[in-house]
Amino acid sequence: HATDGEVDVTIGAGASSTATIAGDLSVAGDVIMADGKGIDFAADASPSAGMTAEILDDYETGTWDGVVTDGTNPMTMHGGYDTGYYTKVGNLVTVTGRFYTTSLGSASGDIKITGLPFTIANNGAAYTSGGAGHGDGLAITAGHSVSFYGQINNTYIHLTVWGATTGVTGMQASEWTADGNIMIGFSYRAA
């Protein structure tokens, strides 16, 4: 529309082109990109020396089902408190949730929460950890707290107990009761 400054562009099937826009771009609908494509931030004049990518090529939100287990024997999860939320932006995944059991089942020894929505990246820089924001029904020593760390190249977090004199030890099934529960929230790098 030459009189109002608007431009309509139609590109034929199979065509490839680049449009350069000097002003703002306003879109009334979704911007849909082909798989593996994204928003390129290559105009960054001074990227960090460790920069490995400038394309935002993934965004996703959803739910994940966590299970407290010793790796072989899952505890019975409370149906209302076994699902958490996640948001994935690029390769950074943020998960939250409250995980509540109704029975220990046959679990023994070190326990973990399985079911993370994406595999944690497989390198030492990908280790991540956190502390439980809330917990009930736990049989840990007074003054101790529950923490955790994500296992690289896997989809679970190790539960740990932090004590002033003992440091960090793997949380045992015996330190969790039938109605034990914790709330967690943390971010990790996906593989």
What would you call each of these model-derived segments?
Residues V93:
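Phosphate-centric recognition/catalysis
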Residues D35, T52, E60, D82, ...:
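Residues that flank catalytic or metal-binding motifs in active/ligand-binding sites
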Residues H1-D70, T96, T101-S103:
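Intrinsic low-complexity, repeat-rich intrinsically disordered segments enriched
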Residues A2, G14-S16, K88, I152, ...:
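Surface-exposed coil/turn segments at beta-strand junctions on protein surfaces, enriched
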Residues T76-T83, R98-A191:
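Extracellular jelly-roll beta-sandwich "head" domains, especially the C-terminal globular C1q domain
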Residues Y59-K88:
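Extended, loop-rich substrate-binding clefts of extracytoplasmic carbohydrate-active enzymes
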Residues D8-T10, D30, T83-Y85, S147-Y149:
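Short, surface-exposed charged micro-motifs
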